[in-house]
């Protein structure tokens, strides 16, 4: 009977302490302006900022200059057709390459289209003609616009020349001669081939993880600075158990970031008409372990923060690296095994891959089972590591308190 009563008391005390820690952590968040910036300002403003920057999706009227050494009807027709495309604007026809290079250096144009003097002659002789394209590769979207426009025009003029050189008796035969194998290009999931639809969903997921790491790390560093023994755990009877600390603190972050997730993953894509074909219920179930894994990872890393500035010095630069190794901006098959392994230490890697497949391509949880299981494994592993960190901090605080008590007792005895 006593044992049962004791167990009930321990459970009741644990629940009360958990909610005390939850309220205390909530106060710490709202009292710290730096943490408020990471928890609210950054996740609410950054998604809008990136979405506004890439809202045009594709580049239109990319500036190009032409060097036409051929000066023939065919070269002028080629230039006219390129200029007529939506993505490219021919701003000047230069006398030579030096003049064209100077315009590129002055950023008056970002590409050069060069026609050699034998361009028209080779075509009339039945030989292959060459058109050279030079691009400023500091802006890949300009390169994409120039390449697509010139390729389409080359194919179109090639069809016209085949029709002229091989006259057919009927219209149907002429169509077969011009285009023997007709094809239709269909852009799946990203119908505009836009940059925002491709990149912004990955950034939205990454922002959640990075702001949690920075915010929780700052809270941990602040707690150490304020603590007499430079410990992560305050000296209080309410902070006398590992699970109650981990559950209490994580409950605070979960409740705060539910709002952040709704804003970043549902409202922002809706505002900017980004692809959203996944089922909301599926998205919610997938984001849940991602949120758990990110929180417990952040709590684990906060144990190594010695000051409130430490997270900014250590983790801010990792955002670009994590975006690259997530497999979005660069195919994951081409990423070296070492960096691929590093990527899977962070929830952002499976989180980005799974979220894009669900939200943009309409995948189900079964189709992202690998990423989903990985996130739950990460959540479990980082929960254990965060418990170990806080257990170590509790034991360390106890030892330091006992050591301080013995020292003070010895000092008192010596004064007597």
Language-model segments: what does each one mean?
Residues 45-48, 186-268:
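Hydrophobic alpha-helical transmembrane segments of multi-pass membrane transport proteins
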């Amino acid at each position: 009977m006593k044992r049962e009563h004791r167990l009930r008391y321990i459970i009741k005390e644990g629940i009360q302490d958990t909610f005390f820690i939850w309220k205390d952590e909530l106060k710490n968040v709202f009292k710290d302006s730096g943490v408020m910036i990471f928890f609210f300002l950054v996740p609410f403003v950054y998604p809008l900022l990136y979405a506004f920057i890439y809202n045009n999706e594709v580049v239109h009227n990319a500036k190009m200059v032409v060097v036409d050494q051929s000066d023939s009807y065919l070269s002028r027709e080629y230039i006219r057709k390129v200029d007529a495309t939506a993505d490219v604007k021919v701003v000047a026809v230069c006398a030579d390459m030096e003049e064209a290079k100077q315009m590129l250096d002055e950023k008056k144009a970002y590409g050069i289209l060069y026609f050699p003097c034998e361009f028209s002659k080779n075509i009339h002789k039945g030989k292959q003609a060459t058109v050279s394209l030079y691009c400023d590769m500091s802006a890949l979207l300009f390169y994409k616009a120039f390449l697509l426009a010139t390729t389409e025009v080359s194919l179109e003029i090639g069809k016209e020349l085949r029709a002229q050189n091989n006259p057919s008796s009927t219209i149907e035969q002429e169509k077969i001669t011009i285009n023997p194998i007709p094809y239709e290009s269909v852009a799946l999931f990203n119908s505009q081939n836009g940059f925002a639809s491709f990149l912004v969903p990955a950034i939205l997921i990454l922002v959640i993880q990075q702001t949690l790491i920075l915010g929780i790390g700052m809270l941990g560093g602040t707690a150490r600075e304020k603590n007499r023994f430079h410990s992560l755990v305050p000296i209080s009877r309410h902070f006398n158990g590992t699970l109650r600390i981990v559950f209490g603190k994580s409950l605070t972050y979960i409740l705060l970031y539910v709002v952040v997730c709704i804003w970043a993953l549902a409202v922002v894509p809706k505002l900017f008409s980004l692809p959203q074909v996944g089922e909301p219920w599926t998205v919610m179930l997938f984001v849940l372990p991602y949120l758990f894994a990110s929180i417990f990872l952040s709590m684990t890393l906060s144990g190594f923060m010695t000051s409130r500035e430490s997270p900014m010095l250590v983790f801010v630069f990792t955002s670009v690296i994590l975006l690259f190794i997530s497999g979005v901006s660069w195919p994951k098959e081409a990423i070296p095994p070492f960096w691929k392994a590093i990527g899977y230490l962070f929830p952002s890697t499976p989180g980005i891959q799974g979220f894009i497949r669900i939200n943009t391509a309409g995948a189900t949880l079964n189709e992202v089972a690998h990423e989903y299981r990985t996130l739950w494994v990460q959540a479990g592993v980082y929960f254990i590591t965060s418990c170990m960190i806080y257990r170590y901090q509790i034991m360390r605080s106890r030892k330091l308190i006992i050591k301080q008590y013995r020292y003070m007792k010895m000092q008192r005895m010596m004064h007597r």
